[in-house]
Amino acid sequence: MARIIVVTSGKGGVGKTTTSASFATGLALRGHKTAVIDFDVGLRNLDLIMGCERRVVYDLINVIQGEANLNQALIKDKQCDNLFVLAASQTRDKDALTQSGVEKVLHDLGAMDFEYIVCDSPAGIETGALMAMHFADEALVVTNPEVSSVRDSDRILGMLASKTKRAMEGGDAIKEHLLITRYNPARVDQGQMLSLEDIQDILRIKLIGVIPESESVLQASNQGVPAVHMQGSDVSEAYKDVIDRFLGADKPMRFTEAPKQGLLKRLFGGK
C-alpha cells in the first residue's frame, strides 16, 4: 500500500515545492518507486523545478475528469527511473479538483505499485491544500524561521488534526514532521530569525530537518534540477539527511550553528 505524504505550509514562498521535488527525488534515489503530484491548480511550478515542463501533455485534472489515464499523464523523471511527476493544470478552475477524483488517483497509483506518493500542496487553506492533505498518512510541515511563517504553520497543524480523512474518521493521527527551511544560524544569533528552540516550542512537532539558507536552491530551480542533486552543497546534504531520518536512520542534525571564525579572521575582521 502506498504511503501518502503531504508537503504543506500556511505561507507561500517557504520552499514547499523545492522540498517536494527534493524529497520525492531522495526517496527514488533510495530505490523506492515514488510519484510526486502538484496540487497547485492554476499556478503549476513543480514541473519547472523537476525540469519536465516541456513534457507535460496531460495533468492531474485531465486524469480526474477522465480525459486521460495515469499512464498518459505521469512523466518519468530523466535522472531517476522510479520517479514520476503528475503536473497540475494551469488553465482549469480549482473546483475541478474533487475529493472523489483525488481519491481515485491515489488509489490507482497504489495499484501501480508506487511505494510513496508525495503531494505538493499550495499554501494556505484553499481547495487545493485541503485536497492535498485529505488522504495523507504523513505530513512535512515546511516553515521559515520567522514569526508569520510559524504562526501560519500552526494553523495548518490545526487543519491536519481536523480536516483530514484520518481525523474525520477517528483513525490514527497523521504523523507530522517539522522541516525548517532557509535557516541561517548567524542571523539567529543576531536576533533576526527565530531559533530552532523557539519554533519547536510554538509548533511542538518533531523536527525532521533543517535546510540552510543558500543560493544553490535558486540555481537548482533555474536549472530545472531538484536541489538534492546539487552535489557538494549544504542544501543537498541537508535534504539527504531528511530522507534518511524519514526512512528511520538516526542522523545528527547539521547546519544549525554558525561556522566558527578562525583566529586571523577574528583579529583582522576578514570575511
Regions found by a protein language model. Give the residues of each.
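Flexible glycine-/small-residue-rich
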Residues: 9, 38, 87-90, 121, ...
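Walker A/P-loop NTP-binding active-site region of P-loop NTPases
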Residues: 4-69, 116
